[in-house]
């Protein structure tokens, strides 16, 4: 821990806490301060000027990052019949119906990262709301995970689709890749994500929409980005 603390202290010296950086500068600094021996995840934290307690100020959606996230995503699909076969052919990791309902409820099984469901299966999936909801795993039409086009949903997810949604403090946390991606690929992923979030601004939102944003690696310090210049 002492060694990691030393690396963190060295990283902090590269960043001016009172400065707001351009996206390109922030990504560059984040890569320079990612000193862990593993391939660190690069994550964005965005605080929005909305009230998540109001339904008309929710911000939620999904976007396919051009270079993915660098993470192998395990997909569970709730479907039957031809749609189940379609899901299997499209590369879903797990496909089924009530048997996975039982597995999750009785075995506390969560060896998956994304859940996709055909609309006719939401009666089954809805019974898992209490366990899937808090983990951010509940399928949702807005994010394209409740659909009859399961092949496209799976393809998008495997290609690097990420979901974004507000937490209770009006902050969105989203990974945009790995340190190994390099500055150019991270910047392209960053731009695609931020364009989607800007477009998702609720009509009911008043005042400054993007209050603050920062970027960091798994073990590195946060680097503040100027909210007035959100695109790289």
UniProtKB/Swiss-Prot annotation:
Transmembrane intervals: none
GO MF term (any one): rRNA binding
Keyword Cytoplasm: no
Gene Ontology biological-process entries: regulation of translation; translation
GO cellular component term, pick one: large ribosomal subunit
Cysteine disulfide partners in this protein: none
Main function: Binds directly to 23S rRNA. The L1 stalk is quite mobile in the ribosome, and is involved in E site tRNA release.
Name of the featured protein: Large ribosomal subunit protein uL1
Organism: Clostridium novyi (strain NT)
Gene: rplA
């Amino acid at each position: 821990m002492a060694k990691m603390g030393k690396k963190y202290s060295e990283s902090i010296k590269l960043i001016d806490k009172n400065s707001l950086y351009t996206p390109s500068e922030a990504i560059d600094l984040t890569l320079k301060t990612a000193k862990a021996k593993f391939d660190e995840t690069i994550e964005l934290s965005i605080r929005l000027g909305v009230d998540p307690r109001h339904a008309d100020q929710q911000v939620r959606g999904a976007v396919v990052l051009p270079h993915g996230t660098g993470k192998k995503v395990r997909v569970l699909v709730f479907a039957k019949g031809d749609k189940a076969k379609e899901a299997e052919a499209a590369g879903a990791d797990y496909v089924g119906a009530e048997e996975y309902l039982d597995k999750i409820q009785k075995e506390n099984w969560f060896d998956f990262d994304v859940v996709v469901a055909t609309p006719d299966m939401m009666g089954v999936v809805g019974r898992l709301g209490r366990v899937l909801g808090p983990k951010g795993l509940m399928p949702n039409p807005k994010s394209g995970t409740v659909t009859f086009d399961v092949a496209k949903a799976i393809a998008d997810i495997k290609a690097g689709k990420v979901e974004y949604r507000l937490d209770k403090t009006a902050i969105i946390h989203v990974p945009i890749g790995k340190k190994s991606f390099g500055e150019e690929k991270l910047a392209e992923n960053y731009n695609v994500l931020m364009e989607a979030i800007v477009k998702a601004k609720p009509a009911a939102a008043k005042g400054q929409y993007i209050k603050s944003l920062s970027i960091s690696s798994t073990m590195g310090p946060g680097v503040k980005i100027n909210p007035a210049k959100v695109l790289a």
